[in-house]
């Protein structure tokens, strides 16, 4: 009798790309904190610094944690599918909660200062991204974690789930870049063109954000780095294929 199949080995370069993405993500979070601390006075909830909670939370939630959530199926290649699903979903929950705190912070700050809401391109994109993120999580939970969805429905929806997950992540990064530029223009005005230290730091932060997104997207699009099907997943896939071809799965 044959022994159990040995777990598939991760492609050689994958761990290095994942490690590089995490290094970039941590640097982005640290640089965001440094920018807010050095040039915007830091963060606080009950003061004029409440606005600064917004960019930090959005970078942590909708950029760093969302990117990590997308990598779960690449990093945990041989763990049980249920475990990876739960981790994938939980990371999105953490990202959503942190982003929600950031969203509340900016609306509270605007209310206290009497500023207008939702007039800029950044704010429109932000609301769109937040709504899409929440909808994606709800639909994903219904199909992949809630026990009522059939295997056939999951199989049909999976490509859309993967595509919109990556698209929402890229939109999140683009929205963060818009917000970064908007914050610089409001604060620095014409001094932005004079290579002010804050502007240079924020520009480097923007480049690192774009690089982080590029590395995440590259990892996701490498077909040979996809999570291999486990034995039980292969059996379900074969049974579904047999059913769709008009036969019944073998009962032997």
Swiss-Prot record:
It catalyses: monodehydro-L-ascorbate radical(out) + L-ascorbate(in) = monodehydro-L-ascorbate radical(in) + L-ascorbate(out). Heme b 1 binds at residues 54, 117-120, 122, 182. Keywords: Acetylation, Cytoplasmic vesicle, Electron transport, Heme, Iron, Membrane, Metal-binding, Phosphoprotein, Translocase, Transmembrane, Transmembrane helix, Transport. The keyword Transmembrane applies. Residues 39-52, 108-125, 181-199 are vesicular. The chain crosses the membrane at residues 18-38, 53-73, 87-107, 126-146, 160-180, 200-220. The lineage of its organism: Eukaryota, Metazoa, Chordata, Craniata, Vertebrata. Pfam families: Cytochrom_B561. It is a multi-pass membrane protein. The gene is CYB561. Residues 1-17, 74-86, 147-159, 221-252 are cytoplasmic. Disulfide bonds: none annotated. It is an enzyme of class 7 (translocase). Changing residue 161 to Q: Decreased protein expression. Decreased heme b binding. Loss of transmembrane oxidoreductase activity. One of its GO terms (cellular component) is chromaffin granule membrane. Heme b 2 binds at residues 74, 81, 88, 161, 226. One of its GO terms (biological process) is ascorbate homeostasis. Its main location: membrane. L-ascorbate binds at residues 81, 85, 154. The modification Phosphoserine is found at residues 248, 250. GO terms for molecular function: metal ion binding; oxidoreductase activity; transmembrane monodehydroascorbate reductase activity. It is found in: Cytoplasmic vesicle, Secretory vesicle, Chromaffin granule membrane. This is Transmembrane ascorbate-dependent reductase CYB561. Its EC number is 7.2.1.-. Residues 20-221 form the Cytochrome b561 domain.
């Amino acid at each position: 009798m044959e022994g159990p199949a040995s777990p598939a080995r991760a492609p050689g370069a994958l761990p290095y790309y994942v490690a590089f993405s995490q290094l970039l993500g941590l640097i982005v979070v640290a640089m965001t904190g440094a920018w807010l601390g050095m040039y915007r006075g830091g963060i606080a909830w009950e003061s004029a610094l409440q606005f600064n909670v917004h960019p930090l939370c959005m970078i942590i939630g909708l950029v760093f944690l969302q990117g990590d959530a997308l990598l779960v199926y690449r990093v945990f290649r041989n763990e049980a599918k249920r475990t990876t699903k739960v981790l994938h979903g939980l990371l999105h929950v953490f990202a959503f909660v942190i982003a929600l705190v950031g969203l509340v912070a900016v609306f509270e700050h605007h209310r206290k200062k009497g500023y207008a809401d939702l007039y800029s391109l950044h704010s429109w994109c932000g609301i769109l991204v937040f709504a899409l993120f929440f909808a994606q999580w709800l639909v994903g939970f219904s199909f992949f974690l809630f026990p009522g969805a059939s295997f056939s429905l999951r199989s049909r929806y999976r490509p859309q789930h993967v595509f919109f997950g990556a698209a929402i992540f890229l939109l999140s990064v683009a929205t963060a870049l818009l917000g970064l530029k908007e914050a610089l223009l409001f604060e620095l005005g014409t001094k932005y063109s004079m290579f002010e230290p804050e502007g240079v730091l924020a520009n480097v932060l923007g480049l690192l954000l774009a690089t982080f997104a590029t590395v995440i997207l590259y990892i996701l699009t490498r077909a040979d780095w996809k999570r291999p099907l486990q034995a039980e997943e292969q059996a379900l896939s074969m049974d579904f294929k047999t059913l769709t071809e008009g036969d019944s799965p073998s009962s032997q």
